[in-house]
């Protein structure tokens, strides 16, 4: 009876069946390109997520100029809601990547950012939009704040220890640039 070895199973389109970034052969034969591509995608997404998360703080100061007549307290609540939502959703995001995978988390979180972005686009054009709708849109803007808790741990899994600091610095540094972008635009 002869023993035959099966060839290594190729990486699945959804799940990585083998991931060994510390193995130099694995890293140089495709692991590196997957890791850097994943870093690029999650960094762009994180930049957009931070922009969406802090968008409300940039919009609230302009709401009276477009016809909204909210009290200072109401405006502060609109500004606070994304932070409250983002902080709470970070607890959920901690478990998402290991449960459903980085690809699904990135896809779903990017799509979820469309709700506050499109919603606020239309809301600022119509001062008759009720306060509770703006409060809900502010909550959904907080979805971007939760992304940080999914992407940083995911990046930690993709890179060998010798490159981990560089990868995390790129992701956090460029990702946080989203805050500045939304304040300047």
Question: Where do the model's predicted regions map?
Answer:
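Glycine-rich segments within core transmembrane alpha-helices of 12-TM secondary carriers
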Residues: 145, 165-185
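C-terminal ends and interior cores of transmembrane alpha-helices
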Residues: 111-127
């Amino acid at each position: 009876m002869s023993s035959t070895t099966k060839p290594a199973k190729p990486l699945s389109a959804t799940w990585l069946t083998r991931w060994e970034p510390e193995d130099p052969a694995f890293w140089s034969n495709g692991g590196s390109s997957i890791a850097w591509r994943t870093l690029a995608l999650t960094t762009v997404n994180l930049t957009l997520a931070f922009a969406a998360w802090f968008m409300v703080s940039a919009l609230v100061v302009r709401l009276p100029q477009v016809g909204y007549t909210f009290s200072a307290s109401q405006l502060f609540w609109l500004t606070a809601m994304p932070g409250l939502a983002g902080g709470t959703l970070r607890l959920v995001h901690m478990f998402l990547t290991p449960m459903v995978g980085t690809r699904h988390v990135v896809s779903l979180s990017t799509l979820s950012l469309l709700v506050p972005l499109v919603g606020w686009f239309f809301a600022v054009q119509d001062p008759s939009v009720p306060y509770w709708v703006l409060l809900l849109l502010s909550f959904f803007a907080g979805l971007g704040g939760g992304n940080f808790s999914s992407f940083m741990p995911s990046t930690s899994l993709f890179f060998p220890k010798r490159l981990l600091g560089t990868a995390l610095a790129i992701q956090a540094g460029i990702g946080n640039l989203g805050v500045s972008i939304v304040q300047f635009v």
